[in-house]
Amino acid sequence: MKSDNDTYYFCACSFGKDSIATILLALRHNEPLDEVVFTEVMFDNQNGISGEDPRHIEWVRNHAKPLLEQMGVKVTILQTEDYISNFHHTICKSKHPERVGKVRGYPIGNRCAILRDCKMRTMGKFIRETRTRYKHYFQYVGIAFDETERLARKMMNSHKISLLAKYQYTEKMAYELCKQYN
């Protein structure tokens, strides 16, 4: 279901079980949903080389996106700047003053630098552009009902809605819902 002209509803989607279950719940319960947005980290944008797991991005492009579009959902794949640029980034500000002016080098695993500097920057730009076009916007997030700590931490923003929490879907229930749609 599309929202009115003043309000925009989108799902920031990782194409994991919780994100997909959120989309399916929106469709099942006639919740407004204007667009699903996936942010693809690019290794080499100029040559079209993705930085995502090849099996995942192939599944997103060739299975999930067409299936959702057949269900009437607009799916947009945003592409980040090359993540390789993070290797050459000069640190301008840091909690550790001795790092300022140095080159970051290789991103450390599990430190969220790529998520923060690539995915979140691209999504932030999308949200800023959305705010200029609509009076109100809401972002569906795939956080399950049984993820209480994460819900408390992530739902402080009044623009975010968890349909999994609204309909009391646990992670297991989200997985089962996704299985129904292959």
PLM ranges: what are they?
Residues 1-182:
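Nucleotide-activated chemistry modules centered on ATP-dependent adenylation/adenylyltransferase
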